[in-house]
Design a protein with these regions (language model features):
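Intracellular juxtamembrane helix-capping segments at the cytosolic ends
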Residues: 66-79
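Multi-pass alpha-helical transporter architecture, strongest
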Residues: 121-153
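Hydrophobic core of transmembrane alpha-helices in multi-pass small-molecule transporters
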Residues: 49-66
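Loop-to-transmembrane helix entry/capping segments in MFS-fold secondary transporters
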Residues: 81-90
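Helix-to-loop junctions at the C-terminal end of transmembrane segments
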Residues: 8-23
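A membrane-interface helix-boundary motif in multi-pass transporters
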Residues: 108-127
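C-terminal ends and interior cores of transmembrane alpha-helices
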Residues: 31-47
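Residue-level signature of mid-helix packing/kink "hotspots" within the transmembrane helices
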Residues: 3-11, 99-100, 104
Length: 154
C-alpha cells in the first residue's frame, strides 16, 4: 500500500511544485511532515486505532514520495552540468554521515520519557530546523549561477 500511495504522492507533489515552485513545495512538505508527527502523537487512541494507523500510513506515504522527489529535483537544478557525480556524492555522504542523528534523538527521547509518543514528537525538531533554514537558501540565485557557470564553460 505504502509504495503505491508514495508513487501517487510523488506525482501530486510534482504538480504542486509546478504550481507553487519546488522550494515552496519542500517547505509545504515540512509543514505536512510536522502535521503527520503531531497526528501520530495525538491521534492513535481508542477503538479506531487501526483505522487511524492506516490513515497515518497514507499521509506518510503521500508526503514521503513527494518530499524526496521534489528535494532531489530542487537539488539537481543547482548542479552544474558535468558535476552531477560530485554533487550527488557529497549529498549522499552528508545524508549518510548525519543519518544517525534522528535515531539518536528519537532513542534519547524514548529513554528520557519512557514512551514512544514523546520520541515521535521529538522528530518535529528536524522539520522545524528545515523550516527555519530553507527560506534562507537562494534557489533562484543558485540556479542562475549554475546557468552562468555552464554558459561560461561552453
Amino acid at each position: 500500500m505504502i509504495q503505491f500511495v508514495a508513487f501517487g504522492g510523488a506525482l501530486l507533489w510534482g504538480k504542486l511544485a509546478k504550481w507553487m515552485g519546488a522550494k515552496q513545495s519542500v517547505i509545504l512538505s515540512l509543514v505536512v511532515w510536522s502535521g503527520v508527527v503531531i497526528y501520530a502523537y495525538f491521534g492513535l487512541y481508542g477503538e479506531t486505532r487501526v483505522t487511524q494507523f492506516f490513515i497515518l500510513g497514507i499521509f506518510i506515504a503521500l508526503v514521503m514520495g513527494g518530499s524526496q522527489a521534489i528535494s532531489r529535483s530542487l537539488f539537481a537544478q543547482m548542479i552544474p552540468k558535468g558535476k552531477e557525480a560530485e554533487y550527488y556524492s557529497f549529498y549522499e555522504i552528508s545524508e549518510r554521515g548525519t543519518s544517525w542523528i534522528g535515531p539518536l534523538v528519537f532513542g534519547l527521547a524514548n529513554q528520557m520519557f519512557g514512551s514512544l509518543r514523546p520520541a515521535l514528537l521529538s522528530l518535529i525538531f528536524f522539520f522545524v530546523i528545515g523550516l527555519i533554514l530553507l527560506p534562507f537558501v537562494k534557489v533562484d540565485k543558485a540556479i542562475a549561477d549554475v546557468k552562468a557557470y555552464d554558459a561560461n564553460r561552453a
